[in-house]
């Protein structure tokens, strides 16, 4: 009996070390950033079982077998659709401003489609204005409405949007709604999901959370896009979820969420529509490719419209493109670079690009919320401040609530707005959407919004920052080490 237990004991020990060795080898064989690999190895060696389970659950990008097969299957038809769209030559921009030229070329070559011109844009900075405009557009919709949000939180004006959407479905408008399972858990637990389906709306719970499949698909991979398309020529996107800030996370202690949305009319709605159709097919297996822009029903203002490129990121989309786009934008800056983000945990490359811009004389500003709803990200962000301040970057801490806007403005002319945070999750993992706008007029509008944020912010004093307590420095470095995993 003793011999039996001895053998079992040795087999358990051998299996334990083989498991650690196997996961270690898997980490080393994967093409990943060195800081990320080192952080995972540290966790596995300090807390082996916890680390191994965490790595198998969250360490690799698993879309899931069924979704991965759908993603592969959809590309031939999507590529054909993109090729056919190129016949609509009147919608594509041929020239860009010097500051935007490199970025637009990058996006065109990586995505197979160029930027589109003749779009009308309106920046909306108040949640009431966003929802009122959206309700008006829904009420006027004639053919189809597609929506995707990370969070839909019942309450306040979000319920008014839901009522208008159900009314549209009842009068014959084809309505589709895709919501992230984790972000919109309150919605799916409420009566609204059943009410919408009964009204004729196709409601899809994207990336459904299922603990039974935790090792088959990465659970923290989320559908983070916020998009609305109406009749294939009106579109919305930006940082705002379908929530009324007066009813959302009131007990978090960070104040109301401050967001930015863009309302657009023009060919960009078609570019966003193909992104939505890909998401819909990956999630449901149903193909819903949008029609090409119809010049007979779409007002086209070539002379006065804005030029926009749409960048989609996430599994199944061009890898690393949004990260490349941010690097290209930072290196293109010659005079001004202003970045707004709620979560700042950049890659080493992006941090280097930002610091280099400041060191070569560019006026670089980063606007962050002073209070953050994520304790981990808040402390990890602070770990980058010393290097940024030393390079000459201005750091503004917004004090008027949780600044949730995601925007970049380069030299007052090249703008990036959308759903992408400057953190690892947005850059490498989630389904995201970003608009790249080449227009000085829009840049002026965005600059006015950013100036308003700065007026409600406190400029971080480099001298006072260096005098912060030792315990804060230790906490910052600890969270910094694990920043590749956040």
From Swiss-Prot:
It is a multi-pass membrane protein. One of its GO terms (molecular function) is cardiolipin synthase activity. GO terms for biological process: cardiolipin biosynthetic process. It comes from the Bacteria. Residues 219-246, 399-426 form the PLD phosphodiesterase domain. Its main location: membrane. Catalyzes the reversible phosphatidyl group transfer from one phosphatidylglycerol molecule to another to form cardiolipin (CL) (diphosphatidylglycerol) and glycerol. Belongs to the phospholipase D family. Cardiolipin synthase subfamily. ClsA sub-subfamily. This is Cardiolipin synthase A. The gene is clsA.
């Amino acid at each position: 009996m003793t011999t039996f237990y001895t053998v079992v004991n040795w087999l358990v020990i051998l299996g334990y070390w083989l498991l650690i060795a196997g996961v270690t080898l898997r980490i080393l064989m994967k093409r990943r950033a060195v800081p990320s690999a080192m952080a995972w190895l540290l966790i596995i060696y300090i807390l082996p079982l916890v680390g191994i389970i965490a790595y198998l659950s969250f360490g690799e990008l698993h879309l899931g077998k069924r979704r991965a097969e759908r993603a592969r299957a959809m590309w031939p038809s999507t590529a054909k659709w993109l090729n056919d769209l190129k016949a609509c030559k009147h919608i594509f921009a041929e020239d860009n401003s010097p500051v935007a030229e490199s970025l637009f070329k990058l996006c065109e070559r990586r995505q197979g489609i160029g930027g589109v011109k003749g779009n009308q844009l309106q920046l909306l900075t108040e949640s009431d204005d966003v929802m009122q405009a959206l309700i008006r557009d829904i009420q006027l919709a004639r053919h189809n409405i597609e929506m995707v949000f990370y969070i839909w939180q019942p309450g306040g004006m979000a319920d008014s949007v839901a009522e208008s959407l159900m009314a549209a479905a009842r009068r014959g408008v084809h309505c589709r709604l895709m919501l992230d399972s984790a972000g919109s858990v309150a919605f799916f637990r409420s009566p609204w999901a059943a009410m919408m389906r009964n009204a004729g709306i196709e409601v899809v719970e994207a990336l459904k959370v299922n603990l039974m499949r935790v090792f088959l698909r990465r659970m923290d991979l989320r559908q983070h896009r916020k998009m609305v398309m109406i009749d294939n020529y009106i579109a919305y996107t930006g940082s705002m979820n379908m929530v009324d800030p007066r009813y959302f996370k009131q007990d978090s202690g960070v104040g109301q969420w401050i967001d930015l949305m863009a309302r657009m009319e023009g060919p960009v709605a078609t570019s966003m529509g193909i992104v939505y159709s890909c998401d819909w097919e990956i999630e449901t297996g149903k193909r819903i490719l949008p029609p090409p822009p119809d010049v007979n029903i779409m007002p086209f203002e070539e002379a006065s419209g804005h030029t926009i490129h749409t960048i989609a990121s996430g599994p199944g989309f061009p890898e690393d493109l949004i990260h490349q786009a941010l690097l290209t934008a930072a290196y293109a800056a010659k005079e001004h670079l202003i970045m707004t983000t709620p979560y700042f945990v950049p890659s080493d490359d992006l941090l280097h690009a930002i610091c280099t811009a400041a060191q070569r004389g560019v006026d670089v500003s980063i606007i962050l919320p002073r209070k953050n709803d994520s304790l981990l990200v808040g402390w990890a962000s602070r770990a980058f401040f010393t290097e940024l301040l030393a390079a000459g970057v201005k750091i503004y801490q917004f004090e008027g609530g949780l600044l949730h806007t995601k925007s970049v403005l380069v030299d007052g002319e090249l703008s990036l707005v959308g759903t992408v945070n400057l953190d690892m999750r947005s850059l490498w993992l989630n389904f995201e959407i970003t608009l790249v706008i080449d227009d000085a007029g829009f840049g002026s509008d965005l600059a006015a919004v950013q100036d308003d944020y700065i007026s409600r912010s406190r400029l971080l004093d480099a001298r006072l920052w260096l005098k912060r307590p030792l315990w804060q420095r230790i906490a910052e470095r600890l969270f910094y080490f694990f920043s590749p995993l956040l």
